Every structure is written in C-alpha cells, then in structure tokens.
C-alpha cells in the first residue's frame, strides 16, 4: 500500500538512500550477532576467567596482518573488554595457552597492561582453525589478502575439507586464493599489509604485473622503502601498482598537451623509433603555423648547443 499516497517507485533518491543504508547496517549488525553467537556456542558452559596476557600465545595459524587497533584500544580503555577471547591449553607448553580467536582483543588488552578475559576450552587443531575461520567470516573484518594468506597457511597443514569448512568457500575460490598467494612474494605482501578495500581482481592484477618483471625482489624492496611505508596500507598497494605499470610514453600511447585553462593544443606520441606531435588546427590554427615556422630555428639552436658542449 502506498505510503502517504506515494508509491515505492515514486519515492525520492534520498528516501531510497536512507533505506539502503538502513538495510546495510541491519545486515552488518546481523553478521556481528552471528559472530558473537558462534563465540557463545564455542564457550558454552565454560566460565570466563582472567589470564595474564603474557601466558597466551597466538594461534599456530596466523589469520591477520598486523594493523591499526586504535579504535579497539579506545573502546576497551573506556568500556573494558566486553567479549572474552577463546583459548585452549597450549598443546606443548604446560601452564600456557593458545588463542583460537580474539587476537586483536588480546593485543589491545596487552598494550593496556590489563588481564585478559578468556574462556579456556580443550580444542583440537582442526577445531581451532574452523572456529577461527568461521568467526572471521561472520565478522567480515578480514581483508581479501588476509583471508587468502590464512587459507594458504591452513592448506599447508590440513586437508582441503578442513580449509573449506574454516573459510566457508568452495573449492574453486580456494584454488584461486592459493594460486594468487603463490604468485606474490611474501615479502611484498608483508610490506603492503592488509590493504582494506582492495579485492581479488586488484591483487590478481598485481600478480600479473609481478610475473612480467625481471626482479620481484626489487618490487618488494620498493614497497619496504621509507617513502612507501609512510602511506596507509591501501595506498601502499596503489603505489606498488603504479610503479609497475608502464608509462604512457613507454607504451607509445598519446599524451595530450594543454594550456593552463584546459585548451587542448597538441597530442604527443612517442616510441623508440619516433616522436609525433599532432596539432589540432581547428582549436589553435595560428599555433600550428607558428610551430612550423620555428622548427628550423629550433634545430639550429639544438645544433649550436651540441657544438658548444663538444668544444668544452
């Protein structure tokens, strides 16, 4: 039934935008609720205790690349650690523990010098990675490259069935992730970081560019440079891509010359064999004549300069 006499199709763009934002927020909240439900189920029947952060080791399979946790630090500083982490008794170090999920919370609480609220539960290696993967998938806070590298690490130690269950993906997408990680030097992805917002197509483009260079190590070295490391992670990715793309001049593609006010005056095409300058007579007819008249004088000036340099 129309709302206030206006059908859905007749609603203004602002109304549609508000509705879309509302739907997105509800979907995000639903995912967070499901992630918390996973945590509750895994911790079901277990008491929350406080542990010394120094007694807890990270998971044996890293899922995250080190990133900014300022927002989480502020939240825990002001409100405390609201959600406990899940740990298991360390399989080889008595008296110590290993994280199943909650690495960022552990890091934040450690930096604040607080005890860690945790649930301790006996878990097999397989249960740890499946719990770790499912919680990450519901929160959707891992970037593409973090997910791909996590899958790659899991694939070294577990069957494809366990990896697929942990990642909640099919065999085809898993294969694509594994091939992509294999194609990228680990030093390069470490230097770039998590790259929020950079999806699989962009990482695939980087892998294809890397395949064409003679020294991938030099690309990683550039990514580790002080200049690039000063940028946010996603900007580091863009900088690396830009450094690998051939310039328009190198590819023989035309460049446009224009005046400060934007008037197009010429198109320049360069290659190893020749340089072509194409002037639009319709846009600047007098300039075309001016250039033709001055080419001989320009060449004479060039020749004289060469003679002078040889005489020095």
Curated annotation (Swiss-Prot):
<dbReference type="Pfam" id="PF07506">
    <property type="entry name" value="RepB"/>
</dbReference>
<dbReference type="InterPro" id="IPR003115">
    <property type="entry name" value="ParB/Sulfiredoxin_dom"/>
</dbReference>
<dbReference type="InterPro" id="IPR011111">
    <property type="entry name" value="Plasmid_RepB"/>
</dbReference>
<dbReference type="GO" id="GO:0003677">
    <property type="term" value="F:DNA binding"/>
</dbReference>
<dbReference type="InterPro" id="IPR037972">
    <property type="entry name" value="RepB_N"/>
</dbReference>
<dbReference type="GO" id="GO:0006260">
    <property type="term" value="P:DNA replication"/>
</dbReference>
<dbReference type="InterPro" id="IPR050336">
    <property type="entry name" value="Chromosome_partition/occlusion"/>
</dbReference>
<keyword id="KW-0614">Plasmid</keyword>
<dbReference type="GO" id="GO:0007059">
    <property type="term" value="P:chromosome segregation"/>
</dbReference>
<comment type="function">
    <text>This protein is coded by a hairy root Ri plasmid, it is probably involved in its replication.</text>
</comment>
<dbReference type="GO" id="GO:0005694">
    <property type="term" value="C:chromosome"/>
</dbReference>
<protein>
    <recommendedName>
        <fullName>Putative replication protein B</fullName>
    </recommendedName>
</protein>
<dbReference type="InterPro" id="IPR004437">
    <property type="entry name" value="ParB/RepB/Spo0J"/>
</dbReference>
<dbReference type="InterPro" id="IPR017819">
    <property type="entry name" value="Plasmid_partition_RepB"/>
</dbReference>
<keyword id="KW-0235">DNA replication</keyword>
<dbReference type="Pfam" id="PF02195">
    <property type="entry name" value="ParBc"/>
</dbReference>
<keyword id="KW-0159">Chromosome partition</keyword>
<comment type="similarity">
    <text>Belongs to the ParB family.</text>
</comment>
<keyword id="KW-0238">DNA-binding</keyword>
<dbReference type="InterPro" id="IPR036086">
    <property type="entry name" value="ParB/Sulfiredoxin_sf"/>
</dbReference>
């Amino acid at each position: 039934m129309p709302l206030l006499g206006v059908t859905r199709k007749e609603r203004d763009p602002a109304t549609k935008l508000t509705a879309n934002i509302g739907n997105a927020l509800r979907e995000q909240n639903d995912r967070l609720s499901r992630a918390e439900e996973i945590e509750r189920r895994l911790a079901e029947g277990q008491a929350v205790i406080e542990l010394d952060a120094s007694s807890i080791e990270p998971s044996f399979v890293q899922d995250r690349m080190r990133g900014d946790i300022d927002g989480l630090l502020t939240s825990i500083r002001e409100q405390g650690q609201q959600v406990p982490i899940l740990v298991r008794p360390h399989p080889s170090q008595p008296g110590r523990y290993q994280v199943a999920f909650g690495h960022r919370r552990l890091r934040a609480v450690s930096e604040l010098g607080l005890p860690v609220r945790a649930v301790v539960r006996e878990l097999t290696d397989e249960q740890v990675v499946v719990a770790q993967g499912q919680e990450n998938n519901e929160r959707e806070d891992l970037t593409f490259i973090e997910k791909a590298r996590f899958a790659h690490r899991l694939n070294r130690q577990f069957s494809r069935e366990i990896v697929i269950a942990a990642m909640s993906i099919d065999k085809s997408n898993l294969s694509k992730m594994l091939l992509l990680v294999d194609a990228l030097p680990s030093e390069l992805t470490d230097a770039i970081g998590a790259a929020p917002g950079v999806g699989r197509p962009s990482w695939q483009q980087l892998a294809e560019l890397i395949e064409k260079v003679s020294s991938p190590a030099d690309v990683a070295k550039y990514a580790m440079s002080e200049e690039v490391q000063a940028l946010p992670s996603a900007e580091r990715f863009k900088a690396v891509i830009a450094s690998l793309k051939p310039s328009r001049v190198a590819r023989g593609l035309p460049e446009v010359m224009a005046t400060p006010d934007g008037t197009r005056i010429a198109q320049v095409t360069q290659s190893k064999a020749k340089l072509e300058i194409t002037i639009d007579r319709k846009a600047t007819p007098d300039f075309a004549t001016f250039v033709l008249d001055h080419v001989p004088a320009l060449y004479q000036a060039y020749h004289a300069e060469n003679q002078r340099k040889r005489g020095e």
